[in-house]
A protein has these predicted regions:
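Compositionally biased, charge-rich terminal segments
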Residues: 1-19
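Class I (Rossmann-like) S-adenosyl-L-methionine-dependent methyltransferase catalytic domain
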Residues: 9, 24-99, 106-155, 174-179, ...
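Local beta-strand N-terminus motif with an aromatic residue
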Residues: 97, 160-161
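A conserved beta-strand element that flanks and buttresses the S-adenosyl-L-methionine
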Residues: 164
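Short catalytic micro-motifs in class I SAM-dependent methyltransferases
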Residues: 167-168
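ABC ATPase nucleotide-binding domain "signature" loop
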Residues: 171
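A short glycine-rich, Lys/Arg-flanked "PGG" loop and its adjoining helix->strand segment in the class I
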Residues: 178-190
Length: 286
């Protein structure tokens, strides 16, 4: 299985380097649909110490090597520690969570751990990647919900005591991020917690690690963050996704101006998720 895992990933990366982007997207889409016809053993694999299998399309796991697997687990557990800290800061505990939304759940890097603390049927797995949502529903027992490019058009089945958004605002243009913030704030239950991560000012020093297209953009990012409070640059061919960095005081002031007195900030940790992304926890109080 390790050979298969590496072979599929290697072939995908090789094709991406040589194919025009539109053709690569077409081939990848056809492959992903074809995978649904294969036995489950070809789509996911169990690893020691990890609850549930990891899907072969879960690119949060760089490889099946032990170091990469340990990092995958550590990032998931770091999210859980931050979620628990946010709950406690809001005077809540896991037992108070009767409805949880993992928005941008992917293939369950965090959801698999949430399902250890919350009955899986009380967790909504939401992502624009429908295959990922189906996997989380089948593997962990979560309720599936397909997201849309326009977050405002998503119909949520209920209000939530806990909403977790890990590493999505980090990739959204500023206006789309604000749209999402308004949507998620609107589906919080009374005393519910919205816990999300962003790339804060500390990430200005690591732009080159996000890809070659960002290596020369540090001056523009620093100017935008200092002057406007946030700055975004797209990925090459990224269909509206990219890298966003937010200044802490600007984000806090924006949320308070838009949503007070309904929301209060109960917890903030700079670079709190995996020593990288800032963690924010806001609680609905009205």
């Amino acid at each position: 299985m390790t050979v298969l895992f590496r072979g599929v990933r290697g072939a995908r990366n090789a094709l991406k380097r040589v194919m025009p982007l539109a053709l690569y997207d077409l081939v990848r889409g056809l492959w992903r649909r074809a995978r649904l016809l294969l036995p489950a053993v070809f789509a996911a694999r169990a690893y020691p110490g990890v609850p549930g299998r990891i899907h072969n399309e879960d690119y949060m796991l760089a490889s099946p090597a032990q170091d990469d697997l340990q990092r995958y687990v550590a990032v998931g557990l770091s999210a859980m520690a931050n979620i628990e800290a946010g709950l406690h800061a809001g005077g809540r505990d896991w037992a108070d969570v009767t409805a949880c939304l993992d928005f941008a759940c992917g293939y369950g890097r965090v959801l698999r751990w949430l399902a250890q603390r919350i009955p899986p049927g009380q967790i909504t797995a939401c992502d624009i990647d429908r295959q990922a949502v189906r996997f989380c529903a089948a593997e962990f027992g979560a309720e599936p919900l397909f997201s849309l490019a326009d977050f405002r058009a998503v119909t949520f089945p209920r209000r939530y005591d806990l909403i977790w958004v890990g590493s999505l605002f980090t990739h959204l243009p500023i206006a789309r991020g604000r749209d999402l913030l308004a949507v998620l704030t609107g589906i919080l239950a009374p005393a519910g917690l919205l816990i999300f991560t962003i790339q804060g000012e500390s990430c200005l020093d690591r732009l080159a690690s996000y890809g070659p297209e960002f290596a020369g953009l540090e001056p523009a990012f620093r100017e935008g963050v200092a002057g406007d409070g946030a700055h975004f640059a797209p990925y090459r061919g990224g269909e509206g996704m990219g890298i966003a960095i937010h200044r802490r005081d600007h984000l806090r002031q924006y949320v308070q101006a838009q949503f007070a007195p309904s929301l209060r900030l109960v917890h903030f940790v700079p670079a709190g998720w995996d020593d990288h992304q800032d963690v924010w926890a806001w609680q609905r109080i009205a």
